[in-house]
Swiss-Prot record:
One of its GO terms (molecular function) is corazonin receptor binding. This is Pro-corazonin. It comes from Apis mellifera. The gene is Crz. InterPro entries: Procorazonin. The modification Asparagine amide is found at residue 32. GO terms for cellular component: extracellular region. Keywords: Amidation, Cleavage on pair of basic residues, Neuropeptide, Pyrrolidone carboxylic acid, Secreted, Signal. In the adult brain, expressed in four neurons of the lateral protocerebrum project axons towards the retrocerebral complex. Cardioactive peptide. Corazonin is probably involved in the physiological regulation of the heart beat.
Length: 107
């Protein structure tokens, strides 16, 4: 009697474990078999995206330094400022903040 209960408990726990592992595998996007896109396309797409996005500012600065693009202002700029997207300002907004030209030609 005790042996049969232990066997039933073992089979039940094994079944639950297998179901949980299968759910974990499929919930994280793991696939078996052929992928829909080739590895070259995937690598090219990831390379383009990583070049366009400043995911890690310090690595981007290091890459520019190693390529020989030395710009001291860029290296001293905080990464928080580099992560903001560029804004397009209207001409009226630019004119509102523009300094007036001097009238006596003294710059």
């Amino acid at each position: 009697m005790v042996n049969s209960q232990i066997l039933i408990l073992f089979i039940l726990s094994l079944t639950i474990t297998i179901v949980m592992c299968q759910t974990f595998t499929y919930s994280h996007g793991w696939t078996n078999g052929k992928r829909s896109t080739s590895l070259e396309e995937l690598a090219n797409r990831n390379a383009i995206q990583s070049d366009n996005v400043f995911a890690n500012c310090e690595l981007q600065k290091l890459r520019l330094l190693l390529q020989g693009n030395i710009n001291n202002q860029l290296f001293q700029t905080p990464c928080e400022l580099l992560n903001f997207p560029k804004r397009s300002f209207s001409e009226n907004m630019i004119n509102d903040h523009r300094q007036p030209a001097p009238t006596n030609n003294n710059y």
